[in-house]
């Protein structure tokens, strides 16, 4: 089961030299949690997760704290916002290195990468490193259960 049957081919991206404010605008206007970061040749150079942007205003220990009232008392309120300097910096300053898969790999391979790295979305590249799609954990799950459903249906007809 090849990835290209299940991936999204229309992907919202951001260029590596665009400011963080542009990324924020994309996160606000589209139901996405991750932006593939591409260069001028459409090559994947990184990923920018919504969490990367949120960490601009959240304390570094935010992920470790379970008591949100405690954070509120320390001043990490919903009114916090990034500074002008943080908003105007290029996304390359806060993006992370991309994990990706190639278009001719299987869903099982993609699932292994996503599980290993705790990813919800996985950029798909061609042999030249150019972004050609995005595969979500839902896409992978749908593809896998479709195969199981087909096998069960065929087996049921044989009996």
PLM feature segments, named:
Residues 1-32, 38-40, 44-45, 70-113, ...:
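Bateman/CBS regulatory modules and CBS-like beta-alpha motifs in cytosolic regions of diverse proteins
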Residues 46-51, 133-141:
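Short hydrophobic beta-strand motif reused across regulatory alpha/beta modules
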Residues 54-69, 140-154:
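A short, polar/charged loop-to-alpha-helix boundary motif
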Residues 54, 123, 128-130, 136-138:
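A contiguous, mid-protein "functional segment" used to position or interact
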């Amino acid at each position: 089961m090849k990835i290209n049957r299940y991936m999204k081919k229309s992907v919202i991206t951001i260029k590596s030299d665009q400011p963080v404010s542009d990324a924020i605008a994309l996160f606000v206007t589209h139901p996405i949690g991750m932006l593939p970061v591409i260069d001028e040749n459409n090559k994947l150079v990184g990923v920018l997760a919504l969490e990367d942007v949120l960490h601009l205003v959240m304390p570094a220990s935010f992920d470790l704290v379970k008591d949100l009232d405690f954070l509120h008392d320390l001043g990490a309120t919903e009114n916090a916002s990034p500074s002008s300097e943080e908003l105007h910096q290029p996304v390359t300053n806060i993006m992370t290195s991309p994990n990706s898969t190639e278009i001719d790999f299987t869903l099982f391979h993609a699932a292994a990468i996503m599980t290993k790295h705790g990813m919800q979305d996985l950029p798909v590249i061609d042999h030249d490193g150019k972004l050609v799609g995005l595969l979500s954990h839902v896409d992978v799950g749908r593809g896998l259960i479709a195969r199981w459903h087909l096998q069960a249906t065929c087996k049921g007809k044989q009996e």
